[in-house]
Design a protein with these regions (language model features):
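Short amphipathic alpha-helical interface segments
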Residues: 2-45, 52
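Short, Lys/Arg-rich nucleic-acid/phosphate-binding segment
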Residues: 72-80
Length: 151
């Protein structure tokens, strides 16, 4: 039996990292619906389990030291959220896994080739590919890395 909730978790983590990296170092509001789509509450007004899982992924990343935030907005968003030093250094560092094609240093400037090897660019590429197996492998790899710089 496939663990679809784990596939969703890895996709949520990737999306959270990409959204927060795009605005770093500014603090922002991160809405669950921007991560996993709109909520579909039940007849009692309770959040859909998928929506709850998206919120839980955001909180888990904070508990594990990848995000800092000031407050929650109900169970729908994190307020004043920003990548932690640990997450920023992980995402901006050179990937040790190299799941994706590297830019050819003969055809592009060295700075562009080096940038293509960062974890954030590798993550963008893997997410665009749409393979949940490759995404799971890459996010799991990143989460297993020791913090850079004591972060």
């Amino acid at each position: 039996m496939a663990d679809l909730h784990i596939d969703d978790f890895y996709r949520d983590v990737a999306t959270i990292f990409l959204r927060l990296y795009a605005v770093f170092p500014r603090k922002t509001i991160l809405y669950v619906e921007d991560i996993c789509g709109p909520d579909q509450p039940d007849e009692f007004g309770l959040h859909h389990p998928r929506f709850q899982a998206g919120f839980s992924a955001m909180v888990w990343l904070a508990e594990e030291g990848y995000l800092n935030f000031q407050d929650t907005i109900r169970a729908e968003a994190l307020d004043q959220v920003v990548l932690s030093q640990k997450a920023f250094l992980l995402l901006s560092s050179r990937s040790k896994l190299g799941l994706t094609e590297q830019a050819d240093e003969d055809t592009v400037p060295p700075s562009v080739a080096e940038q293509s090897r960062t974890n954030i660019n590798q993550l963008r590429h893997v997410l665009r590919e749409g393979s949940s197996i490759r995404l799971q492998k890459y996010v799991a790899f990143m989460l297993a890395q020791d913090p850079i710089g004591g972060g």
